[in-house]
UniProtKB/Swiss-Prot annotation:
Official protein name in the record: 3-phosphoshikimate 1-carboxyvinyltransferase
Residues given in the record as phosphoenolpyruvate binding sites: 23, 95, 123, 170, 347, 389
GO function terms (MF aspect): 3-phosphoshikimate 1-carboxyvinyltransferase activity
Role played: Catalyzes the transfer of the enolpyruvyl moiety of phosphoenolpyruvate (PEP) to the 5-hydroxyl of shikimate-3-phosphate (S3P) to produce enolpyruvyl shikimate-3-phosphate and inorganic phosphate.
Species of provenance: Bacillus cereus (strain ATCC 10987 / NRS 248)
Cross-referenced PANTHER family: AROM/DEHYDROQUINATE SYNTHASE, PENTAFUNCTIONAL AROM POLYPEPTIDE
Segments passing through the bilayer: none
Active site feature: 316 (proton acceptor)
UniProt keywords, alphabetically: Amino-acid biosynthesis, Aromatic amino acid biosynthesis, Cytoplasm, Transferase
UniProt enzyme class: transferase
Pfam families assigned to the protein according to its UniProt record, in alphabetical order: EPSP_synthase
Pathway where it operates: Metabolic intermediate biosynthesis; chorismate biosynthesis; chorismate from D-erythrose 4-phosphate and phosphoenolpyruvate: step 6/7
Protein family: Belongs to the EPSP synthase family.
SUPFAM superfamilies named in the record: EPT/RTPC-like
Length: 429
């Protein structure tokens, strides 16, 4: 277990930063390239532990993948060309890998066994396995398919019209990917619109996808044609530096090539509502995944209420939004965020526990948290509990805390942002 010590930043964070590739898009680019016909070149790929797990799983199924830093080439096998894996498919810490890949495995007529690390073993899989079983896949796991390891024998699927109880891009994507080889038209309806990277990328690979309000449909039997993918920077990773720029005195940061997919930009809307000073300059209008350069500087923030339709657009950013709220005048209420409980950790509990250790006034609710600003934070020993987003949030908190902050299990940040601590150090000089 590696520790990191964070010292207070006295002269602000200043400079330009290129945000590493979007994790969600990197996963999908590898998966879709693997089941497409032809060669896909991916630029801007995120070489973090999670996305490398996706590469290793598809290599295990016979796909020729070469990764060199942030560039990847995938020689696709087509939908029918994957080979039965001889070994267990290990997804590491990646919930995206196991859930999306389950949709592909469900439509493939071979046997596979999928597992991950201790965190994955606690995450609920029935939200994905139940609809896949309804389509005809034979899936089992611990506690009747609730937890990993999962065994999947796929093939011979029938399309379903599924109403998901949760707004989850992973659930939606698994069903749509299974639907690629199902008989009929597969439809998924959600309570709120979740991130739409799967729909956008399927269209880029030549699949016809229909969107009507909160429902997405696709017909089975469509083929994917290889295409080159340019991955923008990950807005979820950018969020830590957006908040840092706003709350650390004497800061001004320029974040380059930040993905601006409208299903992901809740953090931008929240910072604007809180009163942050920033500008957004679009750089690739017309691309299937829009991006922008964002300049942000130290700001006076105010407490707000966050809930409803915006929650799926910022679910991964809530830990660092909570930190921003500790430095805002007034009370911030975050509600309708039950999904925080089934992330790498129960993020309601971990955010409240760790920020409390630093002196924040924050309390948990059943579906979120209440933060009382403005708090003067004090350095302490805190823990990421193996959750990359908790680790990065605590590092930014350490920058404004009085005295040193020691983060236990700090290496967890490598899941999505391997160079995070180096970037932070560089901007603090």
């Amino acid at each position: 277990m590696k520790e990191r010590t964070i010292q207070p930043v006295n002269n602000g964070l200043n400079g330009n930063i290129t945000i590493p590739g979007d994790k969600s898009i990197s996963h999908r680019a590898v998966m879709f390239g693997a089941i497409a016909e032809g060669k896909t070149t991916i630029k801007g790929f995120l070489p973090g532990a999670d996305c490398l797990s996706t590469i290793s799983c598809f290599k295990e199924m016979g796909v020729d993948i070469v990764q060199n830093g942030d560039e990847v080439t995938v020689v696709g096998k087509g939908l029918e060309g994957l080979q039965e894996p001889k070994a267990v498919l290990d997804v590491g810490n990646s919930g995206t890998t196991i859930r999306l890949m389950s949709g592909i495995l469900a439509n493939t007529p071979f046997f596979s066994c999928v597992q991950g690390d201790a965190s994955i073993a606690k995450r609920p899989m029935k939200r994905v396995t139940n609809p896949l079983k309804q389509m005809g896949a034979n899936i089992d796991g611990r506690e009747e398919g609730t937890f990993t390891p999962l065994t999947i024998r796929g093939g011979d699927l029938k399309a379903i019209e599924y109403t998901s109880p949760v707004a989850s891009a992973q659930v939606k994507s698994a069903i749509l990917l299974a639907g690629l080889r199902a008989e009929g038209v597969t439809a998924v309806t959600e309570p709120h619109i979740s991130r739409d990277h799967t729909e956008r990328m399927l269209e880029a690979f030549g699949v016809k996808v229909t969107r009507e309000g909160k429902t997405v449909k696709l017909a089975g039997g469509q083929k994917l044609t290889a295409t080159d993918v340019q991955v923008p920077g990950d807005v979820s990773s950018a969020a830590f530096f957006l908040v840092a720029g706003a709350i650390i005195p004497n800061s001004k940061l320029v974040l380059q090539n930040v993905g601006m997919n409208p299903t992901r930009t809740g953090i931008i809307d929240v910072l604007e509502k809180m009163g942050a000073t920033f500008t957004v300059e679009p750089i690739n209008e017309g691309a299937s995944e829009p991006a922008a350069n964002i300049t942000i500087e130290t700001s006076s923030l105010k407490g707000i209420e966050i809930g409803g339709d915006i929650i799926p657009r910022l679910i991964d950013e809530i830990p660092v939004i909570a930190l921003a709220a500790t430095q805002a005048e007034g009370i911030t209420v975050i509600k309708d965020a039950h999904e925080l409980k089934v992330k790498e950790t129960n993020r309601i509990d971990t955010v409240v526990a760790e920020l409390t250790k630093l002196g924040a006034r924050i309390e948990a609710t059943d579906d979120g948290m209440i933060i009382y600003g403005k708090s003067a934070l004090k350095g302490n020993t805190v823990n990421s509990y193996g959750d990359h987003r908790i680790g990065m949030m605590l590092a930014i908190a350490g920058c404004i805390a009085k005295g040193k902050t020691t983060i236990e299990d700090a290496e967890a940040v490598g899941v999505s942002y391997p160079t995070f601590f180096e970037e932070l150090q560089k901007l603090a000089k």
